[in-house]
């Protein structure tokens, strides 16, 4: 599952807020996010409107902190469990 979330980045003189796609595991725990902030997109006006509606829903959710997310991903990298289960191919 994924949704848009507002993420705060603390700068030296000010904070900035941007929208990111955030991905969750089956328990609702954040397991990943887009590398870059998202912009509204659609291949039609209707799709663009739908994307904007999803983005507006992010404003009703708690703001996430970029430093906290970075710390979480350092301690438990996204997809770590999946990668840990992959064995290298052995040539014969």
Descriptions of predicted regions:
Residues 1-20, 25-27:
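Short N-terminal "domain-start" leader segments
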Residues 8, 12-13, 29, 48, ...:
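Generic structural signal for short, flexible, solvent-exposed coil/loop and linker residues
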Residues 9, 22, 28-29, 46, ...:
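Short linear sequence elements within intrinsically disordered, low-complexity coil regions
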Residues 13-16, 20, 37, 50, ...:
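A general marker of short, structured functional hotspots
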Residues 14, 27, 41, 67, ...:
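Residues in flexible loops and secondary-structure boundaries
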Residues 31-44:
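A short, exposed loop/beta-hairpin motif centered on an aromatic-Gly-Thr core
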Residues 45-92:
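Low-complexity intrinsically disordered segments
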């Amino acid at each position: 599952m994924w949704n848009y979330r507002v993420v705060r980045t603390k700068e030296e003189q000010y904070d900035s807020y941007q929208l990111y796609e955030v991905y969750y595991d089956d328990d609702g725990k954040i397991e990943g996010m887009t590398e870059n902030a998202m912009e509204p997109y659609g291949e039609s006006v209707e799709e663009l409107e739908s994307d904007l509606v999803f983005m507006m829903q992010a404003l009703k959710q708690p703001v996430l902190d970029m430093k906290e997310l970075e710390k979480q991903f350092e301690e438990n990298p996204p997809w770590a469990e999946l990668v840990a289960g992959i064995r290298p191919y052995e040539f014969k």
